[in-house]
């Protein structure tokens, strides 16, 4: 536990983290990935290059410092971190590496006049406290997944049994376990971790499960990303019959039980977790409003499948919005999703459960629009790993 003096020091560094947190975490990642190559597979290099990962860490460190006296207020953020760590198999031995590099980064970026021994000591204690919380919670989750029916710990060998082209950009991959035994049933909205060897280098990635799990196989649907090492490998190299290692499903962006009308809003490849949510909701005969936004029909994945569901389930209402239509299948609206469109497509009664996912700008707009239409904020759920202010 931190003492009162250490907590006061942590809180005093908040202004420094607000102004220079990203510079600190950028330096931290550069140092750690250079000196400890064994942890490189745990981090997406594209997210490093774009700055997304340093920004997300800077936000996490800042939130921790701000709430050092009220850690219970970080429950949502901590839950996200724990699930991400479990999906990538972050282990206790990784924490000392992160801790030592973080303390060095604080000292080197802030300078010894600011990063005094007392400051370093306080942040060392704070990091140790956080590490203990995460390690304990992650072990509980590892154990839970290992002991569940169809579950396992660490990696498990799976074979690609089918792949399907869903749009000009998205391919679905179906994986079944090589041992032929059942697999852990994921909750709708969760993701799975992949461990691959590409050009002699280990790569790990998380992908949302895009179908309700039947206990026999998993499906992910991957968009080809320009310069994306793993997405391009999956699209171009992974063939039916090939094997790879999977980690158990994880994630806390999941469909909660409710009898309220369900609103699922997605942009682009953000559609993937909503598909499993849609399947689960239709099994309960729940009213569902499914709204998807895409550039055009060529990149719109799963349209025929969703249209088929709508034809068989009168409680499902689906709406499509295309930003730049290029002929082919028509959309219900053209342009960007607006509050006026949402007002038309949502139930008249705004007491709904809304789940949305997509690019950052899209999510910021949807969050604002739902609030403007009177959807209770506590009933609007999304998954975003950056600063919450980025969606305001």
UniProtKB/Swiss-Prot annotation:
It is an enzyme of class 1 (oxidoreductase). The record marks 84, 383 as: Influences the redox potential of the prosthetic heme and FAD groups. Binds 1 heme b (iron(II)-protoporphyrin IX) group per subunit. Binds 1 FAD per subunit. Heme b binds at residue 85. It comes from Pseudomonas putida (strain ATCC 47054 / DSM 6125 / CFBP 8728 / NCIMB 11950 / KT2440). Is involved in NO detoxification in an aerobic process, termed nitric oxide dioxygenase (NOD) reaction that utilizes O(2) and NAD(P)H to convert NO to nitrate, which protects the bacterium from various noxious nitrogen compounds. Therefore, plays a central role in the inducible response to nitrosative stress. This is Flavohemoprotein. The keyword NAD applies. Residues 153-256 form the FAD-binding FR-type domain. Its EC number is 1.14.12.17. It comes from the Bacteria. It catalyses: 2 nitric oxide + NADPH + 2 O2 = 2 nitrate + NADP(+) + H(+); 2 nitric oxide + NADH + 2 O2 = 2 nitrate + NAD(+) + H(+). Gene3D superfamilies: Globins (1.10.490.10), Nucleotide-binding domain of ferredoxin-NADP reductase (FNR) module (3.40.50.80), Translation factors (2.40.30.10). NADP(+) binds at residues 268-273. SUPFAM superfamilies: Ferredoxin reductase-like, C-terminal NADP-linked domain, Globin-like, Riboflavin synthase domain-like. The active site is at 95 (charge relay system), 138 (charge relay system).
